[in-house]
Structures are given as structure tokens and as C-alpha cells.
A protein has these predicted regions:
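Outer-membrane beta-barrel domain signature
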Residues: 154, 159, 233-234, 239, ...
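Short, solvent-exposed positions on alpha-helices
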Residues: 139, 143, 219-223, 237
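Terminal targeting/low-complexity segments that flank the catalytic cores of oxidoreductases
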Residues: 1-130, 134-142, 165-172, 176, ...
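C-terminal helix-coil-helix/basic helical segment that borders enzyme active sites and/or dimer interfaces
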Residues: 243-251
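A structural feature that tracks compact, well-ordered secondary-structure segments
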Residues: 126-132, 145-147, 206-212, 224-227, ...
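Amphipathic, well-ordered alpha-helical segments in soluble domains
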Residues: 121-128, 155, 201-208, 235
Length: 359
């Protein structure tokens, strides 16, 4: 065992020749960044099993388990992008100067960057879920958080295998996503971890996974995302149903504090789409490219798809308070708050078999 401890996360891009072997019998060189949190755990001594929605979601999690190595057919060929495709970057002068080969390289790097953020985000979810197992105060919540921890481990495994065996290009975590995860992981308040992860991070991830699944031409990624989406839908539903009741028990000052945190996390999340490392890798003015991307119609449309998932859920749990309404309006995402939330459970949909039975 060899572990290198770093003060900050690595910023290097790992090209195919830089990636470690996906699986090795040799000694792995692990790279670890330490974070500290004044986390207070909680025993639960009555072990009362409430026959409620949380219990049903936990049972579904046990029933709908899947195996990354077995339930995804990895043998299908991978076909990377080989020709430029129409994209909003066509209107950006530095991109216009690229040859077709350079455009293809840029687009493949953008895809790899997005998939890398999925991987890093799922590791963050894994760490938060493990914290919630310890600090959630109720029996059902502990059991569900434990089952979610295993789900998140499976998602990390899936994205890691996909990147290392198919994309073969890995980017470091983006600064915006890292900032959100640092805040959630190091905060001592367990319910803030719930809000940050179950409502915002998981809600945004669910929307992003659904969009990626619709757009990808790779059947392996499509199948993999389909399985991950089933897990994530349960996670978001768990968070809303648990927090809706808990937030009511908080004082007005505590509710205000959580509402401000939710706003700040959403503000940072707008930057999750911006691949600053890719811009810098290709020698662009990163801030100029950032502004171009944020102002593009396709980015605004994608932001809408993402926050249509988050804003109604914040409203449902009582964190869309008067003090933050104007701030959300300035972000341009308040209008999505009246959409349908994920609190109303479609049990038939959540309970569907993972795989269609063959005739």
C-alpha cells in the first residue's frame, strides 16, 4: 500500500498514457486529500421501524441492486467522436480558428471533462452518505443512508471504469463542484448535509444524467446511466420526504440559515457546467470562454433543465423563503419553483424491474 497525502486536489489532466491501469495486482499508488469536520454522530436506541415512505424506499434499494461488472455489457465497441458536430462553440472566434481535427479533440475533451465531474461528484456523494449514516438521528434514515452509501460506491465504480476503459481521459474536479462538496463535508450540521447533497447535488446530477443519457450514442453509457438514474431518483425522493418534515422542527433563524446555504449552493452550481480546465488546456482566455458559455442559449436551456429539478424541491421543503426569493430571481431560476416536485412518489415507476424480462 502506498498513499500520497496532498493539501489540495491534483490539477493535472490525465491523458491515456497518464492513467493508471484500471485494475492491477500490483501496489496501487493512492492519492488522498484530507478534510476535517467536527461531525457529531448519533446512536439510535429504540430501533423503531416506521412503516413509512423512507422504509419503502429502503426496501426498494435492497430489491433493485445491480452489479457494474455483470449488469452492463462492456464488450460493445466504443466509438469516439471523429468529426466536428454542430455546437454553440461554432460562434466563438477561438473555436472557429481550430482545424477540424482540433475541434474534434476539443469536443472529446469537453465530454471527458463532463464525465470526470460525474465521477468526482459521485465520490462526494459517497462520502456525504457515509457521514449521514453516522449522524442522522432516526433509525430509518440511518438504514437508508447506509444503502445509499453502497449505491454511491457503485456509481463511482461505474464512472471510473467507463472513463478508464472507454474515454481514457480524466480531468480534475472543477473548482465550483469542489467548493460545494467541501462546504457540505466539513459542516457539522447533518441536516445541511442532507440539503446540500440530497436536494441540490443529487437533484442536479439526476437532471444531468438524464440529459446525457438522451444525447449519448454509446449504448454502454446509455445503459449505465439508466441504472444510475434509477438509484438517484430514490435518493432525491428520500431527501425531500425526510427534510419536509424535519425543516418544520427548526427555529426561524435555523430555517433562514439553511435557505441562505441552499441559495449559495445553487449559485455555485451554475458554474458546474463551465469547463475552465478545458479552456486553459486549449490556450483560451478562460474567463472570456466562461462568459461566452454562460450567455449561450444552449447553456441557459441546460440550466433550466437542471434547476427545474431543484427549485420545486426547495419550495416543497420550505427553504424558498422571502429572504432568498429575490436572489433566486436574479439568478434567473426562480420561475422553475412552481414545477412539480419529486416529493410525490410514483411507486409504480420506482418499482419497475431494472431489466426487461425476455420472452
Amino acid at each position: 500500500m502506498k498513499i500520497d497525502y496532498l493539501k489540495n486536489n491534483p490539477r493535472e489532466i490525465q491523458l491515456e498514457e497518464d492513467l493508471p491501469p484500471y485494475m492491477t495486482e500490483g501496489v496501487a499508488n493512492d492519492i488522498a486529500e484530507i478534510f476535517s469536520t467536527p461531525l457529531s454522530g448519533a446512536y439510535n436506541w429504540d430501533y423503531t421501524v416506521q412503516d413509512n415512505r423512507i422504509k419503502k424506499l429502503y426496501e426498494l434499494g435492497k430489491e433493485l441492486n445491480w452489479n457494474v461488472e455483470v449488469d452492463v455489457d462492456w464488450s460493445r465497441p466504443f466509438e469516439p467522436l471523429t468529426e466536428p458536430t454542430p455546437i454553440f462553440w461554432d460562434d466563438y472566434a477561438p473555436y472557429q480558428k481550430f482545424s477540424d481535427d482540433k475541434k474534434v479533440e476539443f469536443l472529446n475533451h469537453r465530454i471527458a471533462w463532463s464525465q470526470s465531474q460525474f465521477l468526482h461528484g459521485e465520490q462526494g456523494a459517497l462520502l456525504v452518505a457515509s457521514q449521514l449514516t453516522s449522524c442522522a438521528p432516526t433509525y430509518n434514515a440511518k438504514l437508508y443512508a447506509a444503502s445509499q452509501t453502497f449505491d454511491e460506491a457503485r456509481h463511482v465504480e461505474a464512472f471510473n471504469k467507463y472513463i478508464q476503459t472507454r474515454t481514457k481521459l480524466m480531468y480534475p474536479i472543477g473548482n465550483a463542484l469542489k467548493s460545494i462538496l467541501d462546504k457540505i463535508l466539513t459542516d457539522p450540521r447533518w441536516d445541511l448535509k442532507f440539503i446540500g447533497m440530497q436536494i441540490i447535488i443529487e437533484g442536479l446530477a439526476l437532471a444531468a444524467f438524464q440529459t446525457s443519457r438522451e444525447l449519448t450514442k454509446d449504448p454502454v453509457l446509455r445503459d449505465m446511466l439508466g441504472l444510475i438514474i434509477r438509484d438517484e431518483a430514490r435518493h432525491v425522493t428520500f431527501g425531500i420526504n425526510y427534510l419536509e418534515e424535519f425543516v418544520e422542527t427548526l427555529s426561524e433563524d435555523e430555517k433562514e440559515d439553511r435557505a441562505q446555504f441552499a441559495y449559495e449552493a445553487c449559485w455555485l452550481s451554475r458554474e458546474r457546467l463551465v469547463s475552465m480546465d478545458v479552456f486553459e488546456h486549449f490556450g483560451w482566455n478562460a474567463e472570456d470562454a466562461r462568459q461566452f458559455q454562460l450567455n449561450s442559449d444552449i447553456t441557459k436551456h441546460f440550466q433550466k433543465l437542471l434547476f427545474q429539478r431543484v427549485m420545486p424541491n426547495l419550495r416543497r421543503i420550505g427553504l424558498l423563503r422571502d429572504s432568498v426569493v429575490g436572489k433566486f430571481e436574479d439568478l434567473g431560476i426562480l420561475e422553475y419553483a412552481e414545477a412539480k416536485s419529486d416529493a410525490d412518489i410514483d411507486w409504480a415507476d420506482l418499482s419497475r424491474p431494472l431489466f426487461e424480462e425476455s420472452a
